[in-house]
Amino acid sequence: MELGLGEPTALSHCLRPRWQPALWPTLAALALLSSVTEASLDPMSRSPASRDVPSPVLAPPTDYLPGGHTAHLCSERALRPPPQSPQPAPPPPGPALQSPPAALRGARAARAGTRSSRARATDARGCRLRSQLVPVSALGLGHSSDELIRFRFCSGSCRRARSPHDLSLASLLDAGALRSPPGSRPISQPCCRPTRYEAVSFMDVNSTWRTVDHLSATACGCLG
């Protein structure tokens, strides 16, 4: 490919030695000086035919470019580093194995949860305070009212609160060693009863406020 004055080429981007731009003007000056010296020494020795022949002009180097630039055959591909292949992504970490202490802690937590649920079930069956909405007319106190009140009461088992007397009484009754009085049977365990009460107020059908003391329970306990 011929190199022109206005054509940008990839060769201009290569590195060039510093001595080649100054070499060509020096050679041209030496050739001109040689021709002047030869003409001054023997002006008549040259024929008219030889005068018309121009002096030989040294051809510039093959890698010389106009404007004092020197071109070197090089490849941009050699200057560029080769493309690197993308690195494969590391595999995701697998699930960590559960250590024996963690497994033991999990088993203990499960047993503790079972015990706590069992204790909650026992507490639900035990003596405790409960509440329910009931009509005033169903209280049996002779009041006529269309209102509903929250009636709190005690219920549940007191087997865990039995004393040695209660345990012995139950054993004697079961074995038939103790004759119970006719028409009644001794109670071999305490009873779940209110230990505190509160007053309840409501309005009757005549728009009159009524208050009943010690009507609703506020605390429960095993008595007897």
From Swiss-Prot:
Record's keyword terms, sorted: Disulfide bond, Glycoprotein, Growth factor, Secreted, Signal
One GO process term, biological-process aspect: Peyer's patch morphogenesis
GO function terms (MF aspect): glial cell-derived neurotrophic factor receptor binding; growth factor activity; receptor tyrosine kinase binding; signaling receptor binding
Protein name according to UniProt: Artemin
Positions of disulphide bridges: 127-192, 154-220, 158-222
Residues the record marks as carrying a glycan: 206
GO cellular component assignments: extracellular space
Role noted for this protein: Growth factor that supports the survival of sensory and sympathetic peripheral neurons in culture and also supports the survival of dopaminergic neurons of the ventral mid-brain. Acts by binding to its coreceptor, GFRA3, leading to autophosphorylation and activation of the RET receptor. Strong attractant of gut hematopoietic cells thus promoting the formation Peyer's patch-like structures, a major component of the gut-associated lymphoid tissue.
Similarity remark: Belongs to the TGF-beta family. GDNF subfamily.
Tissue: Cochlea. Expressed at higher level in sesorineural epithelium than in the modiolus region or substantia nigra.
Organism: Rattus norvegicus
Record SUPFAM superfamilies: Cystine-knot cytokines (SSF57501)
Oligomer and partners: Homodimer; disulfide-linked. Interacts with GFRA3 coreceptor and RET: forms a 2:2:2 ternary complex composed of ARTN ligand, GFRA3 and RET receptor.
Residue ranges the record assigns to the propeptide: 40-111
Range of residues in the leader sequence: 1-39
Biased composition (Low complexity): 96-116
Biased composition (Pro residues): 80-95
Domain of life: Eukaryota
Localization of this protein: Secreted
Main location: secreted
Chain intervals for the UniProt region annotation (Disordered): 41-124
